[in-house]
Curated annotation (Swiss-Prot):
Protein name: 12-alpha,13-alpha-dihydroxyfumitremorgin C prenyltransferase
Function: 12-alpha,13-alpha-dihydroxyfumitremorgin C prenyltransferase; part of the gene cluster that mediates the biosynthesis of fumitremorgins, indole alkaloids that carry not only intriguing chemical structures, but also interesting biological and pharmacological activities. The biosynthesis of fumitremorgin-type alkaloids begins by condensation of the two amino acids L-tryptophan and L-proline to brevianamide F, catalyzed by the non-ribosomal peptide synthetase ftmA.
Residues where substrate binds: 94
EC number in record: 2.5.1.110
InterPro entries: Aro_prenylTrfase, Aro_prenylTrfase_DMATS, DMATS-type_fun
Gene Ontology MF, one: prenyltransferase activity
Organism: Aspergillus fumigatus
Single Gene Ontology BP annotation: verruculogen biosynthetic process
Ligand binding (dimethylallyl diphosphate): 105, 192, 194, 268, 353, 355, 419, 423
Lineage: superkingdom: Eukaryota
This protein's UniProt keywords: Alkaloid metabolism, Prenyltransferase, Transferase, Virulence
Organism lineage: Eukaryota, Fungi, Dikarya, Ascomycota, Pezizomycotina
Length: 427
């Protein structure tokens, strides 16, 4: 008799298996699980995750993430008590799919009743609890860099008191200071943290760019001066951290939660001027990277993606839109552009990643553009099935009439390969 070494279940039962005897302390958690669980499972299947890995991924969502998602959003009811930085509508949950490596990622902002009620006005408690629990689950998650940037980029108790006294009422959006992301790969998880120093900037008078660069400098990493110099030069960052071009705004630092020697640092900006020339400048570091063949090859593919998406060029005035949940963006809404650069002591130039935000664009048009780009890349299977996949994630809507399903597309190019991720609306 053969004794199986793995417990398996029919694919269609993976969600039901965990749901059957699940218990949640609140209706909000139950609703988050019932909505996000099937959605995640569909993405995992489409990304060709082995069946044996699907249940652990869902279990992590159910047990660790769902308890930190806060109030479940409902159309027509009161606005969410906490406006998250994760998505356009302030929802603290976003799924994305790295199409080259077939990696599914969940971006989220851990919340608790303390943040939603205003007791924890800058939401410091829930992210700390959640990331500590993540680190207990997987010994590859290292919090050394997380602790470093927490110390330098989060408001202190004294700064909190001052902000609440002197700057009240604080804006609805932008109060969050840290978000997390988990990726499911090779039967395990990897994690990333993102720091938004907007509140620290408001409290100290120092710009977000200066706060981020100073915190990186305090790591005292040998070899990091040159890539930081090239980044400063490209963005025209002055000593105070402000770019000479006021349309460009540093706003975010990303860091891998792994051993410090492997942890990447990512410096993020928004750009209110959306044009191909701006994209090319960011990609090439104003021409400095053109000596690298990888740069030119990636730029050529990025140009094809840009042309296929046909993003309208121009100046974007609305950096933080205030859309009511359940209401589509206005037809004339166009978001800013985003970019990040990976800073490594092992590389002379920082590696760029460009985010072409597509909220407000017709979803059918975006899907047609993506399918055409998949064909350019030789991803013929994905090209032939992509529209059906998206329809399974969002059953019901007529994509010729929606403009919010595809939040954006990110593109980078490393090791002679295009890295393309698609970001989806959580609802």
């Amino acid at each position: 008799m053969t004794i199986p070494t793995e417990i398996s279940c029919p694919e269609e039962d993976a969600f039901q298996l965990l749901d059957k005897f699940s218990w949640f302390p609140s209706d909000d958690q139950r609703r988050w699980w019932e909505y996000t669980g099937p959605y995640l499972l569909k993405l995992l299947r489409d990304a060709k995750y082995p069946q044996k890995d699907q249940v652990p991924c869902l279990y992590l969502l159910q047990q660790l993430l769902v308890p930190y998602l806060g109030t479940f959003p409902v159309v027509g009811q009161a606005p969410l008590p906490w406006w998250s930085n994760v998505t356009t509508y302030g929802v603290p949950f976003e799924l994305s799919w790295n199409l080259l490596h077939n990696i599914v990622r969940i971006g989220f902002e851990p919340l608790s009743h303390l943040a939603e009620s205003g007791v924890d006005a800058f939401n410091k408690t829930a992210p700390e609890e959640c990331v500590s629990r993540l680190a207990c689950l997987d010994n590859t998650i290292d919090l050394a860099r997380f602790r470093h940037f927490q110390h330098h980029l989060l408001v202190t108790p004294e700064e909190e008191t001052w902000l609440l006294r002197e700057k009240a009422p604080l804006p609805k959006s932008g109060r969050g200071q840290q978000t997390l992301a988990v990726e499911f790969q090779n039967g395990g998880i990897s994690a990333k943290a993102y720091f938004f120093p907007g509140m620290k900037s408001l409290a100290t008078g120092l710009s977000p760019g200066k706060l981020i660069l100073d915190s990186i400098e305090r790591l005292a990493l040998p070899g990091l001066k040159e890539p930081v110099h090239h980044l400063r030069s490209t963005l025209g960052l002055q000593d105070d951290g402000h770019p000479t071009d006021t349309a460009i705004a540093p706003f975010l630092l990303g860091v891998d939660l792994c051993t410090p020697e492997r942890s990447r640092l990512k410096f993020y900006v928004t750009d209110q001027v959306v044009s191909w020339d701006r994209v090319a400048d960011m990609w090439t570091l104003r021409g400095k990277r053109l000596e690298d063949p990888q740069c030119a090859d990636g730029l050529a593919l990025l140009r094809k993606l840009w042309d296929l998406l046909a993003i309208p060029e121009g100046y974007r005035s609305n950096i933080r839109p205030d859309f009511a949940f359940g209401t589509p963006p206005p037809e004339d809404y166009r978001p800013v552009m985003m970019a990040n650069w990976t800073l490594s002591p092992k590389k002379k130039f920082p590696d760029p990643q460009i985010y072409l935000l597509t909220v407000g664009m017709n979803d059918a048009v975006v899907m047609d553009a993506l399918v055409a780009f998949y064909e350019v890349l030789g991803w013929t299977d994905l090209a032939s099935t992509y529209k059906d996949k998206v329809a399974s994630y969002f059953p019901g809507p007529d994509f010729t009439k929606t403009n919010y399903i595809h939040s954006g597309v990110s593109f980078s190019y490393r090791h002679s390969k295009p890295y393309l991720s698609v970001y989806y609306s959580p609802f």
